[in-house]
Amino acid sequence: MQTTQETQGALERRIDMSVPMAEIDKEVDSRLKRMARTVKMPGFRPGKVPMKIVAQTYGSQARSEAIGAAVEKAFGDKVREQNLRVAGYPRIEPREAAVEGALEFSAVFEVYPQVPLGDLSGQKVERPVLTVGDAEVDKTIEVLRKQRTTFEAVDRPAQDGDRVVIDFAGRKDGELFEGGKAQDFPFVIGAGSMLKDFESAVGGLKVGETKTFEMTFPEDYHAADLAGQKVEFEITVKGVEAPILPAVDADLARALGVADGDVTKLRDEVRANLEREVKRRIQGKVKEQVMEALLVANPIEVPKALVEAESRQLAENAKRDLEMRGMNTKDIPVEPTWFADQAVRRVKLGLIMAELVNAKELYAKPEQVRAMIDEMAQSYEDPAELVRWYYAQPERLGQAEAVVIEDNVVAWVLSQTQTEDKTVTFDELMGNAA
């Protein structure tokens, strides 16, 4: 076999190969003989079909398979000889034979990039710092109370926080527009489910009162034919209900899972859950900065084949997510190209982290994996059951090991970068800051 190799770009390679036709002919004969032992044809006993008939019937198939095997072997031999790390599958291109009696072809493919690990000492990482106190516990309990709000009819004008029931009809240029009319429509004033101007118009009205008002839809309104348009609404209030929040007492504690209704235990559980969530959020924000630092310090090109494969996987994940929400993805196109930028980032990080793990021996240790699983299990009703679930299948344990490896990478990078603590508020950390 004769071969020549050339570099066509940073990661693209081309190998021209030549295989003697005599070798292929020999392989064709071998395949036909194997077929002849088992082939069945009318009028012949199994294994007794004449070779001439076998060749006439299966010759094209045998030659196609022989050529495919020869191409695969030639390419594989060359890759091993050159110690190339091939990314994706090669594109095989036939060539006009320069030598009589030879099959000539080219394999065009990509290779994995070299990943020289860069200096991280100039990179900065801010670590959020937050101690969960009584104020955070109080705020969370208040949220839990609001989630259990009940409503009671009142005889007064509607105000912020009230649930109202209305009939409404909207007109544009004197004509009803699509989606602009409803009866017995409920919503909570101030909850954000309706436009602010609409909510403001309802505020101050009592049951039985009717009001006509004008408003202008926002320029970015989702219905294009209404965006930026002035319309007129007529509304009639049919119900006004005031919110009733449950008291912080034994009943609320029991409703939130504290069997004996002890409010102190409720606060302790809320605090413990908040501390776990704060820790998770801090780790997430630090991890984001660490990954960005790795990308900045280690600029690399990535094979298109890997990016395309990752884009397809992300698109499939998005489809499954939509299906889990009850949507029919046949009517919703999800194109891999939408995820190209995300795929490039993920592939780069995957290559950089793999090199870093090998170079610095940041592999997951069994005791690390167990500690991580034990910590996760603490938020479950039956921690031991979750531990058994992870250890029941190697695939699940592999997922836990991947998380530990990622944590090891983050810890190592933090030891190499300029890290400084930054005190943040609860809302800032949770992404609720105005």
UniProtKB/Swiss-Prot annotation:
GO terms for cellular component: cytoplasm. It holds the Pfam family Trigger_C. GO terms for biological process: 'de novo' cotranslational protein folding; cell division; chaperone-mediated protein folding; protein transport; protein unfolding. Keywords: Cell cycle, Cell division, Chaperone, Cytoplasm, Isomerase, Rotamase. GO terms for molecular function: peptidyl-prolyl cis-trans isomerase activity; protein folding chaperone; ribosome binding. Its EC number is 5.2.1.8. It comes from the Bacteria. It is found in: Cytoplasm. The keyword Nucleotidyltransferase does not apply. It is an enzyme of class 5 (isomerase). PROSITE patterns: FKBP_PPIASE (PS50059). InterPro entries: PPIase_dom_sf, PPIase_FKBP_dom, Trig_fac, Trigger_fac_C, Trigger_fac_C_sf, Trigger_fac_ribosome-bd_bac, Trigger_fac_ribosome-bd_sf, Trigger_fact/SurA_dom_sf. Residues 161-246 form the PPIase FKBP-type domain. It catalyses: [protein]-peptidylproline (omega=180) = [protein]-peptidylproline (omega=0). Consists of 3 domains; the N-terminus binds the ribosome, the middle domain has PPIase activity, while the C-terminus has intrinsic chaperone activity on its own. Belongs to the FKBP-type PPIase family. Tig subfamily. Involved in protein export. Acts as a chaperone by maintaining the newly synthesized protein in an open conformation. Functions as a peptidyl-prolyl cis-trans isomerase. This is Trigger factor. It comes from Aromatoleum aromaticum (strain DSM 19018 / LMG 30748 / EbN1) (Azoarcus sp. (strain EbN1)). The lineage of its organism: Bacteria, Pseudomonadati, Pseudomonadota, Betaproteobacteria, Rhodocyclales. The gene is tig.
